Amino acid sequence: VVVTSPQDLVSMIVAKAVNMAEKMHVPILGIIENMSYITCPDCGRKIEVFGQSNLDEVAAGYDLKVLGRLPIDPALAAACDDGTIESALPMGLLPEALAVCEAVEVRANADAEPAEPEA
């Protein structure tokens, strides 16, 4: 799994990660954008702190599946720091994080399915 963030220069780092994985014959399940946005606690609007996401374009450029976008969440960060992540948030993780985990699991299982025997 390649993890990126919304900044423009990150696409250069993604290129290095993809090239390294290909040279080492390591399959890439997809790409996740971390720190994608923060949700305003007053109005619920998503604010793109680091600028507009270019995740879809980066993913398309390397033929990667977008597995999800994770927000900046101060409550999640505090729970991680306190070691109380399992009890601090509903179901232990943000819904976005759960969706990313499920997408990774689906991709991993799809890649792990045995090939059809040759006739």
Which residues are covered by each model-predicted region?
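C-terminal lobe/tail of nucleotide-utilizing enzymes
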Residues: 18-119
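Inter-motif core of Ras-like GTPase G domains
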Residues: 1-9, 14
